[in-house]
């Protein structure tokens, strides 16, 4: 599951590429922490029982992660208070904290809605203006990252806009970060100059990224089993999640003709579901090696509509 930049301490693009065992190509560059939370979201979400650590480490091995790195990642997520560790004799398990569960539930809501249906827009814009002293560069970076995650784009320096009704949310987020001077409004915009308000986003670049993912989905047709199915499915999910940080969810009226968001969502959902039975069987195998009774808890998640 994708992580909010300010709530997880995990950069969307950090980490090294991990080759999925048996997969036809490597998972794209992504942090190991993101891979772990994606496994929780896709296979153990809404399960109150903690997941055996050995099963997690095994699944992470399917994604190309060596055991020492996998265990170090679990320890890091515990320090970030996204996972909690339990010990019962020699057995160790990991479960989501309330904070980790909230992040996954937020991501689940996004997955259920983004690209599923056309976006209805009332023509108004959320506008955020803020001022942060140049000396506080770390705060400036965090504030901008958070606004991008919420779907805002920079119209001018210190002026960010979004067609979604998220002005109040943005104000609350920035004040919580410690931004001292924030003004928000919801209003009509009359922007002079070429491109209009849409120039706040790199729509050409986002369109190219959709094209890359379309080619990946077209190439992903093999009937995979075992580790290869789990790795392929996780890689596709992580690639789709990345669009949350680059596609602001603009309505059709603001987009170029034939914007591919809904088409790609449909392709992704179908392929994700096709890989589901084999990937879930692999995850159950990892869990059953430690505790056969817990294998029933592996989630059967489907995205197609």
Where in this protein do the model-derived segments appear?
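Short alpha-helical segments that sit at the start of domains
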Residues: 2-6, 10-42, 102
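Short acidic, hydrophobic short linear motifs in intrinsically disordered regions
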Residues: 47-59
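Short, hydrophobic-biased segments on the C-terminal half of alpha helices
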Residues: 71-75, 92, 144
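Glycine-centered, phosphate/nucleic-acid-interacting loop/turn motifs that mediate DNA/RNA or nucleotide
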Residues: 81
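Short, Lys/Arg-rich nucleic-acid/phosphate-binding segment
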Residues: 87-93
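Short, amphipathic alpha-helical interaction segments positioned at domain boundaries
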Residues: 101-125
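Mid-protein regulatory/catalytic core that forms ligand/cofactor-binding pockets
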Residues: 133-223
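C-terminal regulatory/effector modules of DNA-binding transcriptional regulators
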Residues: 197-305
């Amino acid at each position: 599951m994708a992580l909010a930049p300010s709530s997880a301490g995990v950069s969307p693009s950090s980490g090294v590429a991990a080759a999925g065992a048996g997969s036809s190509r490597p998972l794209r560059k992504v942090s190991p922490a993101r891979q772990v939370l994606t496994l929780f979201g896709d296979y153990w979400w809404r399960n109150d029982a903690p997941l055996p650590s050995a099963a997690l480490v095994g699944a992470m091995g399917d994604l190309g992660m060596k055991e020492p790195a996998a265990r170090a990642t679990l320890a890091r997520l515990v320090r970030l208070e996204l996972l909690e560790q339990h010990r019962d004799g020699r057995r160790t398990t990991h479960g989501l904290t309330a904070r980790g569960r909230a992040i996954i539930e937020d991501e689940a809501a996004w997955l259920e809605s983004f690209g599923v249906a056309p976006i209805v827009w009332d023509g108004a814009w959320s506008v955020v203006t803020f001022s942060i002293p140049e000396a506080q560069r770390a705060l400036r970076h965090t504030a901008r990252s958070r606004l991008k995650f919420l779907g805002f784009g920079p119209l001018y320096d210190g002026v960010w806009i979004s067609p979604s009704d998220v002005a109040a949310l943005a104000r609350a987020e920035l004040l919580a970060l410690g931004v001292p001077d924030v003004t928000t409004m919801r209003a009509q915009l009359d922007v002079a100059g070429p491109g209009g308000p849409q120039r706040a986003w790199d729509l050409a670049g986002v369109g190219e990224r959709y094209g890359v993912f379309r080619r990946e989905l077209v190439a992903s047709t093999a009937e995979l089993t075992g580790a290869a199915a789990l790795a392929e499915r996780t890689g596709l999910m992580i690639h789709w999640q990345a669009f949350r940080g680059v596609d602001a969810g603009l309505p059709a009226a603001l987009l170029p003709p034939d914007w591919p968001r809904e088409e790609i969502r449909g392709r992704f959902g179908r392929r994700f579901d096709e890989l589901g039975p084999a990937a879930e069987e692999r995850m159950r195998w990892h869990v059953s090696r430690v505790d056969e009774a817990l294998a029933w808890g592996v989630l059967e998640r489907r995205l197609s509509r």
